[in-house]
């Protein structure tokens, strides 16, 4: 499937994996709109994205604002949801339940709200691609909240693929990727995470956002894929 003149909306498309996906789709001829809650982030992203890329600011945790966003955008072909604040590992003995609920607000309910709002505007043959992570398959200590979110998104993906057919619904499950996702960690801790991960997995390195963007393009363009969780982790689930 060619993306030429296809309308692609990337929620969370101003940084990290979302930005790389938006750029890759635009380079394949798509008409891309990136969305972030921060207008300044939208402006910075547009300065670095191919000409013809559009941007809008919207609070993806505000249901009414999300519905207005899609009303303004009109008909689209593909929805990509990569939005998410930097993760914080939380062991059970230090668990902050309010913070845990906050993580679900954007990463799970934000995705569900976006799909609900976008459905009336998705053209026939369109697709939805959500974002999960390998924590659902192989969690480590401190990953109870993150693993739960990833598991919820994977279940949501499969349920939506059935309910919304023939609209295709898939999700990408990255492993550890060098991206702003880890900005809540100190630089030393972050670099140690990258080194430890690279040493432990078959690929021998951590992922880059451009690696993961190719997985999203696959989900956008593969007409026979739906209900799939595409794991792109350098073999981390095998390590």
Residue ranges and their predicted role:
Residues 80, 110-118, 156-157, 215:
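Hydrophobic positions on the long internal alpha-helix
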Residues 49-64:
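Rossmann-fold cofactor-recognition segment
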Residues 84-101, 183:
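Conserved mid-core segment of classical short-chain dehydrogenase/reductases
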């Amino acid at each position: 499937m060619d993306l030429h003149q296809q309308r692609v909306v990337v929620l969370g498309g101003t940084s990290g994996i979302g930005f790389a996906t938006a750029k890759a789709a635009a380079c394949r001829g798509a008409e891309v709109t990136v969305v972030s809650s921060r207008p300044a982030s939208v402006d910075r992203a547009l300065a670095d994205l191919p000409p013809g890329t559009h941007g809008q600011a919207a609070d993806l945790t505000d249901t009414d604002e999300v519905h207005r966003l899609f009303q303004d955008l009109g008909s689209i072909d593909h929805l990509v949801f990569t939005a998410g604040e930097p993760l914080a590992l939380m062991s059970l003995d230090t668990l902050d339940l309010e913070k845990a609920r906050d993580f679900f607000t954007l990463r799970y309910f934000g995705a569900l709200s976006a799909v609900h709002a976008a459905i009336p505007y998705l053209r026939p043959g369109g697709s939805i691609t959500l974002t999960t992570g390998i924590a659902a398959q192989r969690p480590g200590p401190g990953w109870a909240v993150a693993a739960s979110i990833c598991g919820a998104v994977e279940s949501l993906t499969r349920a939506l693929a059935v309910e919304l057919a023939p609209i295709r619904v898939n999700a990408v499950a990255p492993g550890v990727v060098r991206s702003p996702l880890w900005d809540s960690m100190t630089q030393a801790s972050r670099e140690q995470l990258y080194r430890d991960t690279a040493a432990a997995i078959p690929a021998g390195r951590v992922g880059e956002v451009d690696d993961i963007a190719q997985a999203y393009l696959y989900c956008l363009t593969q007409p026979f894929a739906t209900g799939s969780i595409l794991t792109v982790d350098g073999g981390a689930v095998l390590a």
